[in-house]
Design a protein with these regions (language model features):
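Cofactor-binding beta-sheet edge motifs in enzyme active sites
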Residues: 1-142
Length: 142
């Protein structure tokens, strides 16, 4: 956490996915990495806001930030194999758990990093402005 700007950088992310029987390991890795990248967005950047008339304020990629490879940490992934009894090859869908699990994992890591300031909860997205305002309120901003 940058105390001067409030920017949060995820430096390392470890994820283990239960893939069932793996048919193509490269596709599985790509799905997990893609799911994790899609989880970084709602955790740190993506917020849908509306104006007083109910119109979406950030309705284009010019003003709606989606993370790129530059914002993604070093992924450390592994797989466990528990064959699905509901598929003839024992395969399972993969990547979705990373998308769903990443935002709360990142939020918990940020709250833990700020716990020495008495922080116990932050709503996502955990934007730099939110973090900087919190640091300022706690007297910890640079």
């Amino acid at each position: 956490i940058d105390r001067g700007t409030g920017e949060v950088k995820v430096r390392r992310f470890v994820a283990v996915d239960d893939c069932g029987n793996i048919i193509n390991p490269m596709i599985v890795d790509g799905q997990i990495h893609g799911g994790l990248a899609q989880g970084v967005g709602p955790a740190l950047y993506e917020e849908i806001s509306y104006d007083e008339d109910g119109n979406i304020s950030g309705g284009s990629f010019l003003d709606y930030y989606v993370p790129t490879a530059l914002e993604c940490p070093k992924w450390e992934t592994d797989k466990t194999v528990t064959p699905s009894p509901h598929h003839p090859f024992g395969a399972k869908g993969v990547g979705e758990s990373a998308t769903v699990g990443a935002p709360p994992a990142i939020a918990n890591a940020v709250v833990d990093a700020l716990s020495h300031l008495g922080v116990t909860h932050l709503d996502i997205p955990i934007t730099p402005e939110k973090v900087w305002q919190l640091l300022k309120q706690k007297g910890a901003a640079e």
